């Protein structure tokens, strides 16, 4: 029943999306949606995470996790950053993302408003938008490339000089591939729609990550992030950092990013803490394979 509903939603989204003006990024997304819809024929829910699996977060890299949180679990991810751009220094927090597993392979997430404090120009400080989303793990079978589809929208609740005007929907596809000896690759393709923006109606974001597990609890990563607006030049930066699991349900992390061109921040330094609470509410969970290792 869940796969039928998900496939129907994706099919309708693809149909509506195809009616919009097309860019190269939108062509790629339409193709991805059709592949996702086709995959519902054979996709099974028995490989998605359970409470026996360790916490996997969307931090500290820009690339989000390709897997969902377990059914009935609530995951809270937080962080604080310090950044510099064009002579201004900004401190932002708490960058809180709430992730709830509402069914096998399906989660509901919300990015809560984050406060951006401009150290040199306090009048340019304020809150970002609240952004709810649905995330569906498409390829849950262990041993293969993990892939998820996310559809969300940033609602116009933030401060005018921090958040853009109007609602901003987005469609996102994070993926990951575990290699041998603790190495892994991951990435993400996102299309942001900005119908109220007079200069650029859309931004395509691509990321690519190389990760290495250095101990049973710690791992390091290097990440490329590129934002490509429909009009104007891109913003590109290199991000690196690591994470440490205090327990199966708790994580500490850090990251350091350096801008690669003048459109990106000069630097970003941040730290974070995430925690998962299991079996908080009832959610449907299908039989599954043994937990991942």
Which role does the model predict for each range below?
Residues 1-53, 280-293:
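Cleavable N-terminal export/targeting peptides
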Residues 44-293:
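Transmembrane beta-barrel domains of Gram-negative outer membranes and organellar outer membranes
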């Amino acid at each position: 029943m869940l796969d039928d509903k998900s496939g129907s939603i994706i099919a309708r989204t693809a149909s509506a999306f195809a009616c919009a003006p097309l860019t190269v990024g939108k062509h790629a997304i339409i193709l991805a949606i059709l592949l996702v819809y086709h995959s519902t024929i054979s996709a099974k829910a028995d490989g998605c995470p359970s409470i026996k699996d360790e916490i996997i977060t969307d931090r500290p890299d820009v690339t989000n996790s390709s897997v969902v949180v377990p059914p009935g679990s609530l995951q809270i991810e937080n962080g604080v950053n310090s950044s510099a751009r064009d002579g201004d220094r900004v401190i932002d927090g708490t960058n809180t993302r709430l992730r709830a597993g509402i069914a096998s392979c399906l989660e509901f997430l919300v990015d809560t408003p984050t406060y951006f404090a401009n150290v040199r120009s306090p009048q340019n400080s304020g809150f970002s938008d609240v952004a709810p989303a649905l995330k569906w793990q498409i390829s849950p079978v262990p041993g293969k490339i993990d892939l998820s589809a996310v559809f969300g929208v940033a609602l116009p609740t933030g401060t005018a000089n921090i958040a853009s005007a109007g609602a901003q929907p987005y469609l996102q596809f994070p993926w990951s591939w575990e290699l041998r000896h603790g190495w892994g690759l991951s990435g993400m393709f996102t299309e942001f729609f900005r119908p109220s923006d007079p200069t650029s109606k859309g931004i395509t974001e691509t990321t690519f990550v190389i990760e290495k597990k250095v101990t049973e609890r710690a791992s390091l990563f290097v990440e490329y992030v590129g934002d490509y607006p429909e009009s104007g030049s891109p913003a590109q930066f290199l991000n690196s950092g690591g994470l440490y699991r205090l327990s199966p349900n708790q994580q500490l992390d850090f990251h350091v990013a350096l801008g690669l061109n003048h459109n990106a921040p000069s630097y970003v330094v941040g730290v974070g803490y995430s925690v998962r609470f299991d079996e908080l509410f009832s959610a449907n969970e299908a039989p599954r394979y043994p937990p991942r290792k």
